[in-house]
């Protein structure tokens, strides 16, 4: 029985790139190799237009499951490779068709003759290949407009690829081509989705989480670690910075009027994150803010909070409503972690009536009454940093270490 020997990867948005396209292709190849570390027999060949993954006996379903989370891949096809002879092509097309799962009633044949010296033209090949499938199946018909299965045949010099099973990739651009940002990872539903969407644009992320023991628990801290771990499905690794925020929050609660405490808290977070971004050579800050969702996410609040940093603030969720955000969170695997009932620092000392239209002038006047600089320095100096990698990669490294 013939089996899938290759996976053909299509780039999608990367095809619009010009002179730097080779950088995008190289980064994608590197990301795919990292993602498929568990499969030692595969070989990867990345050309200008697509990528060829030779399976060499590896499980195509297991490989496909990992490929679907790699940004930069538009679609990929499971493919069989056969000699460019009519009978081999017909047999390969039938074998590929028979491996398609589900309720299949209709099909069509698509032929692309890259090898123009092949003795038969496309219009001659279509009935030959389609007829062979019809002769060897039951209750199957041809539908050229809306088929259940499109049997694609690419004819080249010496060999041809046969493809039926087409799957969607994650889209976007390869993580690593767009620089690095610091993402504020709160532990809620929104910020992991913001991190995911930022990575989808080819940007590497490092996460900053503010925790305030004893007001926030170790379980709340572990929840954020688990969220960062879940995000490693979409990149090589996530560096997480855990910032002690207790003294800053206690001082804000004591020195700042309650209506402005939330605004000042967010401004302090931005100042600390900017300091870490400078240390880590990040170029922007990403947040999970959605316009109008809570008091700190009005335009007035954002205008006042933005004042304290010169870094660009990326807000991927800014126009989304909560249901749209939840839908993505469920799809990427972060929702169930985010709804664990452990409070983060944003719920500590929550004011009864936070200002929804805070002014920069007032925020500056309130902050000027107390020197927060030593507290900011202390928070940055005492941060805990950990590097999280895909679970499979960690397991492989531990297995390797056990050998010595």
Curated annotation (Swiss-Prot):
One of its GO terms (molecular function) is tRNA-uracil-4 sulfurtransferase activity. The lineage of its organism: Bacteria, Bacillati, Bacillota, Bacilli, Bacillales. Pathway: Cofactor biosynthesis; thiamine diphosphate biosynthesis. The gene is thiI. Catalyzes the ATP-dependent transfer of a sulfur to tRNA to produce 4-thiouridine in position 8 of tRNAs, which functions as a near-UV photosensor. Also catalyzes the transfer of sulfur to the sulfur carrier protein ThiS, forming ThiS-thiocarboxylate. This is a step in the synthesis of thiazole, in the thiamine biosynthesis pathway. The sulfur is donated as persulfide by IscS. ATP binds at residues 184-185, 209-210, 266, 288, 297. Its main location: cytoplasm. Belongs to the ThiI family. Its EC number is 2.8.1.4. Keywords: ATP-binding, Cytoplasm, Nucleotide-binding, RNA-binding, Thiamine biosynthesis, Transferase, tRNA-binding. This is Probable tRNA sulfurtransferase. Pfam families: ThiI, ThiI_fer, THUMP. InterPro entries: Rossmann-like_a/b/a_fold, ThiI_AANH, ThiI_fer, ThiI_N, THUMP_dom, THUMP_ThiI, tRNA_STrfase, tRNA_sulfurtransferase_ThiI. GO terms for biological process: thiamine biosynthetic process; thiamine diphosphate biosynthetic process; thiazole biosynthetic process; tRNA 4-thiouridine biosynthesis. It is found in: Cytoplasm. Coiled coil: none annotated. The keyword Iron does not apply.
